From Swiss-Prot:
This is Ubiquitin-conjugating enzyme E2 E3. It comes from Homo sapiens. Pathway: Protein modification; protein ubiquitination. InterPro entries: UBQ-conjugat_E2_core, UBQ-conjugating_AS, UBQ-conjugating_enzyme/RWD. The active site is at 145 (glycyl thioester intermediate). Keywords: Acetylation, ATP-binding, Cytoplasm, Growth regulation, Nucleotide-binding, Nucleus, Phosphoprotein, Transferase, Ubl conjugation pathway. The ubiquitin-loaded form interacts specifically with importin-11 (IPO11), leading to its import into the nucleus. Interacts with NEDD4L. Ubiquitously expressed at low levels. Highly expressed in skeletal muscle. Its EC number is 2.3.2.23. It is found in: Nucleus; Cytoplasm.
Length: 207
């Protein structure tokens, strides 16, 4: 009996020691297999690299084109127009258009925002008026209804040609394709009143 108790006591530390080792093992430590799963696959890495290269190529193409147009418009700006980057961002420009002589906007200075996307010149720039203007093809948010800024855009067009088209729109509006229907109707039915208000707005907001 005494011998059996001693044997039992001798075996207890061994059992306790084994339990202690299990308790000391860090349950949060990932198994080697788990660490393997967390690494991105070679296919995923290749896909990410390809997407990054494609984006960089698009930015490079658009930036080169915009730089080229900036050099051209600086050397030879369209009549009554100027344009260039707002700061260090080549994709964000500010433009100034002087009201065409003989138009109801004569004497006004109109500011516009120009935003190029990374898809330029395959997609048109976004051009909006910052200065308020009374015009049936330009709404109160400065959005311009001009076909070459929408469906009729072509990569062969440049920002200089866009500004020339906007100047032409200031000289001769297009009431057949209005953005502000009430102004278009007034232009067609009461031209004198239309011109009076347009000159009034030019004096109030653009001088």
């Amino acid at each position: 009996m005494s011998s059996d108790r001693q044997r039992s006591d001798d075996e207890s530390p061994s059992t306790s020691s084994g339990s202690s080792d299990a308790d000391q093992r860090d349950p949060a430590a990932p198994e080697p297999e788990e660490q393997e799963e967390r690494k991105p696959s070679a296919t995923q890495q290749k896909k990410n690299t390809k997407l990054s290269s494609k984006t960089t190529a698009k930015l490079s193409t658009s930036a080169k084109r915009i730089q080229k147009e900036l050099a051209e418009i600086t050397l030879d700006p369209p009549p009554n127009c100027s344009a260039g980057p707002k700061g260090d961002n080549i994709y964000e420009w500010r433009s100034t258009i002087l009201g065409p002589p003989g138009s109801v906007y004569e004497g006004g200075v109109f500011f516009l925002d120009i935003t190029f996307s990374s898809d330029y010149p395959f997609k048109p720039p976004k051009v909006t008026f910052r200065t308020r203007i009374y015009h049936c093809n330009i709404n109160s948010q400065g959005v311009i209804c001009l076909d070459i800024l929408k469906d009729n855009w072509s990569p062969a067009l440049t920002i200089s040609k866009v500004l020339l088209s906007i100047c032409s729109l200031l000289t001769d509006c297009n009431p057949a394709d209005p953005l502000v229907g009430s102004i278009a109707t007034q232009y067609l039915t009461n031209r004198a009143e239309h011109d009076r208000i347009a000159r009034q707005w030019t004096k109030r907001y653009a001088t």
